[in-house]
Amino acid sequence: MAGSSFTLPSTGSAPLDMMLIDDSDLLQLGLQQVFSKRYTETPQSRYKLTRRASPDVSSGEGNVHALAFIYVNAETLQMIKNARSLTEANGVKDLVAIDVPPFRNDFSRALLLQVINLLGNNRNADDDLSHFIAVALPNSARSKILTTAPFEGSLSENFRGFPITREGNVACEVLAYGNNLMPKACSDSFPTVDLLYDYGKFFESCAADGRIGYFPEGVTKPKVAIIGAGFSGLVAASELLHAGVDDVTVYEASDRLGGKLWSHGFKSAPNVIAEMGAMRFPRSESCLFFYLKKHGLDSVGLFPNPGSVDTALFYRGRQYIWKAGEEPPELFRRVHHGWRAFLQDGYLHDGVMLASPLAIVDALNLGHLQQAHGFWQSWLTYFERESFSSGIEKMFLGNHPPGGEQWNSLDDLDLFKALGIGSGGFGPVFESGFIEILRLVVNGYEDNVRLSYEGISELPHRIASQVINGRSIRERTIHVQVEQIDREEDKINIKIKGGKVEVYDRVLVTSGFANIEMRHLLTSSNAFFHADVSHAIGNSHMTGASKLFLLTNEKFWLQHHLPSCILTTGVAKAVYCLDYDPRDPSGKGLVLISYTWEDDSHKLLAVPDKRERFASLQRDIGRAFPDFAKHLTPADGNYDDNIVQHDWLTDPHAGGAFKLNRRGNDVYSERLFFQPFDVMHPADDKGLYLAGCSCSFTGGWVHGAIQTACNATCAIIYGSGHLQELIHWRHLKEGNPLAHAWKRYRYQA
């Protein structure tokens, strides 16, 4: 059956130019009047044009007409205005009219793009949706229905699309045209999807007072121990001291501060930084960038992720070059296009539209939090039991792959593993949960990624150097291993190496899971945690990761015009050329020769000697890219000082690089994240609270470390003094996480 034809009305009923209307309420009223005047003849037949749906209205002649909207860019709109019919509008492709009006303020551009792409026959981009054309067409015209998963609290919503084709034989009248007034997201930061609460905004709201809470006169201030001087522990110490706690002691088993915020400096090149831990910092990490700005460390540059810079791909014995900002080589384009289509179009699961990742990002960005909750819950419902591998197979090997092109099972999956989703090959983490990887995308952690020119460890160093109440946090830190933590009545005993015991009122633990379970012995009884929290600690998956850096005499990739990123299926996996001093192109260079995860990292543990490992990696890169590998020699021939490596799995203080949930394990993150909230229930509150990125929904990201530090700090302030609830709230800053009305998800254990 043919679609609707497209003809402009006669001169007497020319479409109304609404280009000057920039208010959604006025646009709604204007469109209502235009449609009502044209298609209703009696007052009784008038209708109200709502924001949620476009009406069907009788013309009084037995015909029922629907109001729908075509979305186009400015150029296409002008071509259609100049033509008397679609056939005269050269270059205009087949269009689709949908029943989503341009004044809907709960409908983002990304969601509109998804609906149009799924209802139409063409692929559109965001720039194609800047203008609308309002059309009336018979309700009997051929159409397609798209059903969404839960939307804005309702069970579902249906969208209707009418194909507008050159061959159509159903009249379609243009009524008006104008600017699309649907909101367009533009912020760099937004709440993370599992929380729907912006910790960055909370810290901003506290900036004027310089504290997140305080202790009223007459309230006994607690004696507090913080186990671990990673970033979470240092943030908590700083916030507690600023809130007025006088007695804070930080215990750190290693000889340095900062945990996984660890920047190695080279003696011969002090401006060159090897980030042994966290090295990629997305702009969406609002908490991190709040602290960077607060401490004068906002000098950042773009991280050279694959495709953002010239990239070499070595796959099955052949070398491919991927120019910066362009499409990847032809061999990889099917999987690249499929993934990009998934980001825009989401997935049709058994006929139900699951919101695209970009639509979820827009909902978060625009503050449509109920909508974001519904979108994310739908993905949890349908995909939480999937690994990333099985989820990708389900989508792209099935009958309705995003983008419309089905993948070949083995070859395309291998290509996708090598190419990754933005930050390099994801093959080693394919058995992680699908939701866990999707979480990275939705939280914006794969986009707009930065590096810190000063080195990220400068941030914990500056926090630790703050002098509060006459002493710095560094001076309050004891470098010793905590061996055991136990409870005695309403006090908590900390036993350190050597047998000494200190007694505290409140304890914040930021240690890794292995230390919590095997050294501190916190899960061996129910003295501190409910059984489900202990289970989460014992069963959360920590990812192994290895890095090896090389300081070179020159930035050879600039001088010889070589790719600054290499992805290989060999041992090295991912190679990055890093420039921490771009103002000096003749200065020393830094190459992250190998960054590996999981099984790829485990292989390297067989070669612990860094010189031997370097030689192996250099040979591997030489097979893939000999012109690059020949420049891989340490500056000044100094192998001892100018090659550095670290294996996070064998680090006794870490027990892994970061938490990465397996399928079905997202409930562990929920249990760990909300553990400090027990303080609001006196019968459950044991005075010990968890923090650290591994206790968040975003393991491995600084954002999660700060969020959990904030939770624990608020819990300590709230729980001190045994006051009435009303008083508790008075000495915590308004809008704090304990007072927030959390909208929890249904995670499936």
From Swiss-Prot:
Superkingdom classification of source: Bacteria
Residue positions binding FMN: S232, E252, K260, R280
Residue spans crossing the bilayer: none
Key words, A-Z: Auxin biosynthesis, Flavoprotein, FMN, Monooxygenase, Oxidoreductase, Plasmid
Keyword Coiled coil on entry: no
Cofactor descriptive note: Binds 1 FMN per subunit.
Protein name in the entry: Tryptophan 2-monooxygenase
